[in-house]
From Swiss-Prot:
Residues 1-26 are annotated as: Disordered. SUPFAM superfamilies: Ribosomal protein S20. Binds directly to 16S ribosomal RNA. Gene3D superfamilies: Ribosomal protein S20 (1.20.58.110). Belongs to the bacterial ribosomal protein bS20 family. GO terms for cellular component: cytosol; small ribosomal subunit. InterPro entries: Ribosomal_bS20 (IPR002583), Ribosomal_bS20_sf (IPR036510). This is Small ribosomal subunit protein bS20. GO terms for biological process: translation. It comes from the Bacteria. It comes from Glaesserella parasuis serovar 5 (strain SH0165).
Amino acid sequence: MANIKSAQKRAVQSEKRRQHNASQRSMMRTFIKKVYAAVATGDKAASEAAFVEMQKVVDRMASKGLIHANKAANHKSKLAAQIKKLA
């Protein structure tokens, strides 16, 4: 642990941010997994509904800087292509 007061504060803030970011990242991954699961069942309506929810979450995480914008785009395009195949 740091000795300087400001460094101690930064360490505490950093740990809080790390835990929050881990929680947000886990939540985002869960939404992505829900889309993959819906695609695996072959139900296009359920897949599209899950995709819309996932898209909102992924875009929010990208706008907040939790993931890169290109990574968000890759997730969305890959899953959109899989849903399109279900037709």
